[in-house]
């Protein structure tokens, strides 16, 4: 049974639907997380067909709160309908749908009667009014052989790996599994090329990158 509580307004038109809302409560800040539909791409913002992100709230949702400016959360090609819960350790955990509706991809697994997946489960934290995400620490138990390289290329006989790149220069290029990444002047450009099955190019504005962590399996690549 649902009871009506209130209507939450934003100070300007913002799409035609906010799907999959979640109310996230941290000690110092509250957030309304949702997946807006109907936003126009502008200056590399909102490049996906549908977005995901959050409105910081000035106070509790039950009170006369005001929605602050929307912050796009995850810039992946396929991420939607995130759900959140608190685990037995008190952590805020998130998982999302690694897929999108209403889009013409040519995923090769469709011929096998399947497509899409869950994202990695991620711990969500709050710092100075913003949300941060990183894979839960339990994935460390899956680690096996470790390899370290410096100043050279690395060839592996598997597509399933976790990769940490540290001490990144101010600009760099990275080619990995058919995907080209270029970082320059605070802009990360990811080009999926033919490996994208209809996914093309995305841009993420990141003022400074010190390190990068990648999780790869046979059909996906998650970048943090």
Where are the regions a protein language model picked out?
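Conserved catalytic-core segments centered on acid/base and nucleophilic motifs
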Residues: 11, 21-25, 223
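Solvent-exposed, flexible loop/coil residues
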Residues: 12, 22, 118, 122
